[in-house]
């Protein structure tokens, strides 16, 4: 008698399939509409039955407009009209942003012809919901522009692949730190600059766009940069000169007159001794000035002004500038303007190192820099863009006052930085290094590292000059914590950078100073830094 083996596994599968087919109550099990979604047709025909849906389509296909209203919402987004004379590829850019990346609030902005906060003739703004959508839309635009052969496209705001690897490696080493502490957050603003057509495309999150008020940027005037920087209740009399006027006169006597009258009034109230010495120095400085020795004369005056602040004033510096400006035989160059700006921005104080007195000096510097800038705009000696960048650089420089043992930093330096960011004014490398120097000397190292990381996020490739500058700042600070941070994180960034930083004797000297300034307990620490220094020194000797 034959024997049969019972297949329990097959039996279990058959049982499960049977019970599923009989008792499955899921909406997809039967190809009919669920009762709650069946339309009420009782008014038309009481005996009518709901129609069965085709077996090839599930029930939710006919209800897609009710279930997925998001697509219908984005289809309703209107595209802005393309300006006259614009290139044809802008239509494809708008369609790509709308249909594929669901960008909203698409709009064009025409930058004024005399504006210095933008090099582009036309600006396109697009908003996304989050930082990841900003990155996706930017990468998609890069691929489209490459297909259109529009020429070189500069991208700002995207994090490079090598930088992401460094941050991920630090995250694995320090699991107790969050993404925010390691600055691994998403990109909230990117900019694509098409050089051949003078077009900039800004892809930004909605929160950032609302905060920076980019839609009103075409109505911005340049006067915003140098007017009302004080935003306080301080009288304009204290901003005019360090000399005190006659107290017998009422305060409104000075306030009700023009700036020229107030400057003349304060100048006439100098003491007889100061006026006599000032007159002698004036005759020595401005004697036989011509176009050949103008630069050397201004440099000589700058040296005298910085070394003898009791004999000179900002009023006198402005009067020298006005005399040179009105002389048709003399022509001020960029170097001469730089010397005059630096003389005002670095003017020392005759008062004690009190916070109130230092703040008044910063206000005076800003006022006289603004007055000189207004005169240079009318003079048109250099182009407007270079002049305004130079003006902003020395406005930042004027916010720091050097004392006998410490530095005073005015908080208006952060207001200037916000103005530059809000109006899209580019910060040059020289201005960035100046900002880092001022913050480091004022012991604001958290602000130094935050700006360093922001520059890294913008995709800027650091060179030897930037790294050497931060090494020297750390060495001069004599701060053990700062030097440790530089020899770990900053050095790791430099070694991992592609293309690599070329070996130089200056770099080896700066790193060696940082290592030697540490206490003896770090004698065997930082082996990678020590090996790098030895390798660079050996390569320079052979």
Swiss-Prot record:
Pfam families: RsfS. Residues 39-52 have a biased composition (Polar residues). Residues 34-56 are annotated as: Disordered. GO terms for biological process: mitochondrial mRNA processing; mRNA stabilization. mRNA stabilization factor specific for the 0.95 kb oli1 mRNA. Also involved in oli1 ring formation. Belongs to the ATP25 family. This is ATPase synthesis protein 25, mitochondrial. It comes from Schizosaccharomyces pombe (strain 972 / ATCC 24843).
């Amino acid at each position: 008698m034959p024997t049969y083996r019972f297949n329990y596994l097959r039996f279990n599968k058959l049982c499960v399939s049977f019970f599923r087919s009989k008792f499955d109550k899921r909406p997809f099990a039967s190809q009919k509409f669920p009762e709650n979604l069946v339309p009420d047709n009782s008014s038309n025909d009481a005996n009518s039955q709901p129609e069965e849906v085709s077996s090839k389509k599930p029930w939710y296909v006919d209800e897609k407009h009710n279930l997925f209203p998001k697509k219908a919402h984005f289809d309703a987004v209107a595209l802005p009209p393309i300006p006259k004379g614009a290139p044809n590829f802008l239509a494809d850019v708008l369609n790509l942003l709308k249909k594929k990346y669901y960008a909203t609030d698409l709009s064009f902005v025409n930058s004024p012809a005399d504006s210095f906060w933008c090099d582009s003739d036309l600006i396109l703004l697009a908003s996304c919901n989050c930082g990841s959508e900003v990155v996706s839309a930017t990468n998609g635009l890069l691929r489209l522009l490459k297909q259109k052969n529009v020429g070189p496209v500069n991208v700002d705001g995207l994090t490079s692949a090598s930088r992401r690897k460094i941050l991920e490696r630090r995250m694995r080493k320090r699991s107790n730190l969050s993404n925010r502490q390691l600055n691994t957050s998403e990109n909230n603003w990117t900019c694509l600059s098409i050089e051949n057509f003078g077009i900039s495309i800004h892809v930004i999150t909605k929160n950032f766009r609302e905060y920076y008020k980019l839609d009103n940027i075409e109505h911005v005037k340049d006067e915003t940069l140098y007017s009302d920087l004080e935003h306080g209740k301080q009288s304009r009399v204290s901003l005019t000169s360090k000399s005190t006027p006659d107290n017998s006169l009422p305060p409104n006597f000075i306030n009700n007159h023009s700036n020229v009258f107030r400057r003349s009034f304060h100048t006439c109230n100098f003491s007889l001794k100061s006026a006599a010495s000032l007159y002698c120095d004036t005759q020595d400085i401005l004697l036989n000035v011509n176009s050949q020795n103008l630069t050397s004369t201004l440099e000589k005056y700058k040296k005298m002004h910085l070394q003898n602040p009791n004999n000179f004033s900002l009023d006198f510096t402005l009067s020298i500038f006005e005399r040179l400006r009105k002389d048709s035989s003399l022509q001020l160059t960029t170097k001469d303007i730089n010397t005059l700006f630096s003389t005002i921005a670095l003017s020392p104080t005759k008062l004690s190192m009190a916070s109130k007195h230092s703040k008044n000096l910063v206000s005076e510097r800003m006022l006289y820099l603004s007055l000189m800038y207004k005169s240079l705009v009318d003079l048109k000696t250099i182009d407007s863009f270079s002049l305004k960048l130079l003006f902003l650089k020395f406005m930042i420089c004027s916010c720091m006052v050097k004392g006998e043992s410490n530095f005073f930093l005015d908080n208006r330096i952060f207001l200037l930085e916000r103005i530059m960011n809000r109006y899209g004014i580019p910060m040059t490398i020289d201005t960035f290094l100046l900002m880092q120097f001022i913050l480091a000397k004022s012991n604001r190292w958290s602000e130094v590292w935050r700006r360093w990381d922001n520059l890294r996020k913008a995709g800027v490739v650091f060179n030897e000059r930037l790294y050497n500058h931060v090494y020297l700042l750390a060495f001069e600070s004599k701060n053990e914590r700062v030097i440790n941070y530089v020899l770990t994180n900053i050095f790791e960034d430099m070694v991992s950078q592609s293309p690599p930083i070329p070996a130089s004797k200056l770099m080896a000297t700066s790193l060696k100073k940082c290592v030697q300034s540490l206490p003896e307990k770090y004698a065997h620490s930082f082996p990678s830094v020590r090996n790098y220094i030895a390798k660079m020194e050996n390569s320079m000797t052979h």
